[in-house]
Amino acid sequence: MESGPASMSSSSSYLYQEQQQQQPQQTESIPQTPNYILKYTLKGHLKSISSVKFSPDGKWLASASADKTIKIWGAYDGKFERTLEGHKEGISDIAWSQDSKLICSASDDKTIKIWDVESGKMVKTLKGHKEYVFGVSFNPQSNLIVSGSFDENVRIWDVNTGECTKMISAHSDPVTGVHFNRDGTLVVSGSYDGTVRIWDTTTGQLLNTISTEDGKEVSFVKFSPNGKFVLAGTLDNTLRLWSYNNNKKCLKTYTGHKNEKYCIFSTFSVTCGKWIVTGSEDNLIYIYNLQTREIVQTLAGHEDVVLTVACHPTENIIASGALEKDRSVKIWKHM
């Protein structure tokens, strides 16, 4: 959405260790450079694509749009499955529950909705935010949802009751991203106020604040797969990987993509080497080597700003979605 309405050689080895399965010795070595190609282009949304997310079980891809709908597609074949309708305004973000049965959505109508994916029915509407809801995330246990809003607050919700259990006055400008860590004990939030903040899920207590260089607006935040680091995007064409516990140190900086205007999603690729994948305002997808920070591949095909990207949980598949002139979701596969 548009703004306005030390070396890690040791640490990165355990950044991904939880994701990697035991491999037989004859397994091919991990490639030094990725080789993704366009496999499917999915049409159907009537406005900009705001968020794409794979289900944790790997079967489905969900896409959300400014057209007020969520669409469900087959993750492997791109086949359209169903549309989830009910929001009164555009949707900015979506998240899956761990069992892949529920989706929550954040909308400009100031609500969060919970959906049963199989039936396509809306289960609950969560009300409390006073402005656009911009980001949502399920905790790993999927009994809580965290949301961030343009009202500068972060809220934690009980999935079963739909009640807000915690309201945190988190920032002094709109909240642009929220995410739970891998055990659900922490929440990270980012904001246009130039800070990334870490919160205790249970108490709502502020544990740490990371301030960006020159107070640059934070456009995206996400915990690393093991929860030890935070990836943050800022509106100066930069992604940074931070340690947040005590030294609050910027460990890696990734530049080359274009990001000065929109809140663009980035993510970790854990299935084929150690990459960071991000959208970009030059209509490309950028893949960075996490360790060396080099751009190892760019993916061309979209005809507008690539606002959102996601990586499949087990296969070498990337999904992407773009803005108004494009309106497509694309699925890319590693060859």
Swiss-Prot record:
Keywords: Nucleus, Repeat, WD repeat. SMART domains: WD40 (SM00320). WD repeats lie at residues 44-83, 86-127, 129-167, 170-209, 213-252, 256-298, 301-335. Residues 9-30 have a biased composition (Low complexity). The keyword Repeat applies. GO terms for biological process: transcription initiation-coupled chromatin remodeling. The keyword Hydrolase does not apply. One of its GO terms (cellular component) is Set1C/COMPASS complex. InterPro entries: G-protein_beta_WD-40_rep (IPR020472), WD40/YVTN_repeat-like_dom_sf (IPR015943), WD40_repeat_CS (IPR019775), WD40_repeat_dom_sf (IPR036322), WD40_rpt (IPR001680). Residues 1-30 are annotated as: Disordered. It comes from the Eukaryota. It is found in: Nucleus. Its main location: nucleus. Belongs to the WD repeat WDR5/wds family. May interact with the histone-lysine N-methyltransferase complex. This is WD repeat-containing protein 5 homolog. It comes from Dictyostelium discoideum (Social amoeba).
